[in-house]
C-alpha cells in the first residue's frame, strides 16, 4: 500500500502493489502505478524464476526504529536498517536466499505497515502493532 517501502529502490510506495504468490513464487504483480511497473521490470530483467521466489519474512520489534527514517537520508547514505526493524512492520523479501539454494541478483526487501502476523496460531503483530 501507499507508504510501505521498497528498499531495493529506496523509496516509499506511492500506489498499491499486490503480489500474487503461488507455490513459493510470485506469479503476478498487480497494480496500475509506477511502483508495480518498476517491480515487474526489475524482476523480469534477471530472467530467472528464483528472482520471483519468497526469500525470507520477519517482523520488526524495535520500538525506537522509525518508519519515516528513509525520508531523512540521501539514497547513497541509506541501507534501510530502521525500516526493516521498526516495531510492527512485516518484512516480506523476494529472490536470493543462499540457504534455500536460490542464487539470483533479483531481490526485494519490502517492509509493510498495518499487517497482522500470526506464528503457529498466535498473533504477534495486529494491524501493525506488536501484540
Language-model region placement:
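Metal/cofactor-centered catalytic core regions of large enzymes
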Residues: 1-131
